[in-house]
Swiss-Prot record:
Compartment list: Membrane
Gene: C1orf115
Claim: rRNA processing is one of the keywords in the record: no
One Gene Ontology CC term in the entry: 9+0 non-motile cilium
TM helices/strands, residue ranges: 116-138
Name of the protein described by the UniProt record: Required for drug-induced death protein 1
The keyword Transmembrane belongs to this UniProt entry's keyword annotation: yes
Sequence segments annotated as region (Disordered): 1-32, 46-66
Keyword vocabulary terms for this entry: Membrane, Transmembrane, Transmembrane helix
Major localization class: membrane
GO biological process: regulation of response to drug
Superkingdom of this protein's organism: Eukaryota
Pfam families: RDD1
Length: 142
């Protein structure tokens, strides 16, 4: 027996399953039982309506039953809640994100400008170096 099967059987034995969807019933019984329970509840409700008592009182405390939902109509002067107008300022989280991106873009621009300046200086030095060498050689030859 594999570990998974052992754990599954242990869990099944320790947990009690109740109701129409429990593992104690077969698949065919499950659907039939649910339909029969529904029909039995309808019969109990009709009998209770005739006798004046509720079906929940007959079943006793602790048993499960259907819940009754009460609907309330809206008053005639119903005014829907107004949503607040969107403010001109961006939301706090969005502002934090913009601030973070702004810092990163600023760093990139600063570093990029430094590298451009260094590159231009190197280009200028390389461009002017042959002339400096030529002038020094010419002055040395004279």
């Amino acid at each position: 027996m594999t570990v998974g099967a052992r754990l599954r059987s242990k869990a099944e034995s320790s947990l009690l399953r109740r109701g129409p969807r429990g593992r104690g019933r077969t698949e065919g019984d499950e659907e039939a039982a649910a339909i029969l329970e529904h029909l039995e509840y309808a019969d109990e409700a009709e009998a209770a309506a005739e006798s004046g008592t509720s079906a929940a009182d007959e079943r006793g405390p602790g048993t499960r039953g259907a819940r009754r939902v009460h609907f309330a109509l809206l008053p005639e002067r119903y005014e829907p809640l107004e949503e607040p107008a969107p403010s001109e300022q961006p939301r706090k989280r969005y502002r934090r994100k913009l601030k973070k991106y702004g810092k990163n873009v600023g760093k990139v621009i600063i570093k990029g400008c430094r590298y451009v300046v260094i590159g231009l200086q190197g280009f200028a030095a390389a461009y002017s170096a042959p002339f400096a060498v030529a002038t020094s050689v010419v002055s040395f030859v004279r």
